Amino acid sequence: MGINDNGIYGSLKGNSTTGGIYKMGDHNTGYGEKNNQNNNNKSGGKTIVNGVIVNSNQQKLKGDENEFDHSQDDNADEFNKFPKKVKYNDLLYSVLFAIQMVLFITMTVIAGTKHPNKKEFVEYSLQGLLIIAISIPLILAFFLIWKKIFKIHPTNMIKTSFFSLMITGILFIGLLIGNGWYSWAIVFGITLISLIFFYFAFRDKIPFVGIIISLVLKIIEKYPSTLLVSFVCLIISCVYYNIWLFSVSYNFYYDSYWTAWSYMKFMFLVFNLYWTHYVITYTCYSVVSGLVASWYFFADEDFNGMPPKPCAHSLYRSMTSSFGSIAFGSLLVCLVQMVQFICRGFARVPGLTSLFCNCLQFIALIFTRMLYTFNIYTFSMVSIYGQSFCNSSKKTYNLMVNNNEKLFATHNYMLITMLSVSLSMFLIIGFIVTMIMATIQLENQGWLYVQLVMFLFILYKPFDIIFSSVLTILMCLISDPNAMEVTKPNTFILLSETYDFKSLNP
């Protein structure tokens, strides 16, 4: 069983896919269910579980026989080494993304050569880097403290997160009423009531979510490279955002009035911003999902059996065979958000046009969030099975339709937990960073606010990878719960006490 450049590992002989784990729905993974005696037969120092030979250090997929001689297999390369030729999925969208990035760089360089004052931009960019330098150590320290507490009291931490978010919501609604913003108070009041209803309707899922988050924290502790990947993506994002601001400012520096060409350039820059942002975000998700899926299908409770350098291999797959799929999925979200952006502009025109555009903008906003969330699940499937975006989307849709209640409960508990923790971090660390920057007395306070927005991206990054990791484990459990039963039986028993695996519909 060899790691595949398109998916987590190569397909079995007779059940070939496009380079992924297995054909979903067939469950021909060789894992199989344990019999009444757990099928723990010993043979030559190996444990045989319904045709699956499990060494102390590595799990190997087998067929119905106790041994499988790869030397007699015509497709032995599938099991033992990387394929000689990588299959690039959705290659067209990789090319399109590269073309629009070349256009963006060209526009930026041309604008920069014409602008008389580049020193000002460099000074402001250094201020942003200063905020990043101050923020990251504080965030990592806060995250490590939270991680240690959560590993000890996972269920209580989730409950505490809910109640703290509820209290914050009540205080915020009171603030809105005090300032006379009654319409917004009604909106947030309805949201708060929905949150309370959700908590009491699905509170029986809290122990399961707590166990999953604890498993993810264990993986991150074992492979801190996941955090490194996350912060590298963050740094790339911050550098790109500064360059984008440079390009927007300097492209329109001399424009006393806007022509049709000016509007076209501006729309392209907005399009470039959205598409690049989502590509960076989903690439990070894909890398982390690939590592977590490797842990799910290969490793035991002590991480024995993990392939070498799983994070590096997952990064390689995300930047090669899966990058076209990432660019394709990101483009879809980008296009919907462009519709929202255009409607926001036309909504400023008074009359019926404003009302229509506001309604359309609201619909586009909801659809953007739905598509963004759907893509997170889809890219987990892309990382696991190495298939194209369309094929992965179809499988993701079927899994979500057949298991909507479990996905809904787990997703929202995870999201609200991360939101409440991030909110508390923002209040504490944001106050510290603001005080430090105030004592430095920056010349341009407006630019400070722009950099504080970037600070929000830094704040959420450690929890971003936890969120994507939890969703990946959930997708793996729905796809093939028997895999965990074989590789991690103790964890499977623990999860079975809080989760009805028989009700899953892969």
From Swiss-Prot:
Q: Where in the cell is it found?
A: Membrane
Keyword set, alphabetical order: Glycoprotein, Membrane, Transmembrane, Transmembrane helix
- Annotated glycan sites: 15, 41
The entry's cellular-component GO terms read: membrane
Superkingdom of this entry's organism? Eukaryota
InterPro entries per UniProt: Choline_transptr-like (IPR007603)
Membrane topology listed for this record: Multi-pass membrane protein
Quick one: a GO biological-process term for this protein? transmembrane transport
An example Gene Ontology molecular-function term: transmembrane transporter activity
Q: Show the stretches that span the lipid bilayer.
A: 91-111, 126-146, 161-181, 182-202, 226-246, 256-276, 279-299, 323-343, 345-367, 371-393, 416-436, 447-467
Asked if the Swiss-Prot or TrEMBL record annotates the protein with the keyword Glycoprotein, the reply is: yes
Q: Which family does it belong to?
A: Belongs to the CTL (choline transporter-like) family.
Q: Which PANTHER family match?
A: CHOLINE TRANSPORTER-LIKE (SLC FAMILY 44) (PTHR12385), PROTEIN PNS1 (PTHR12385:SF4)
Which named protein is this?
A: CTL-like protein DDB_G0269978
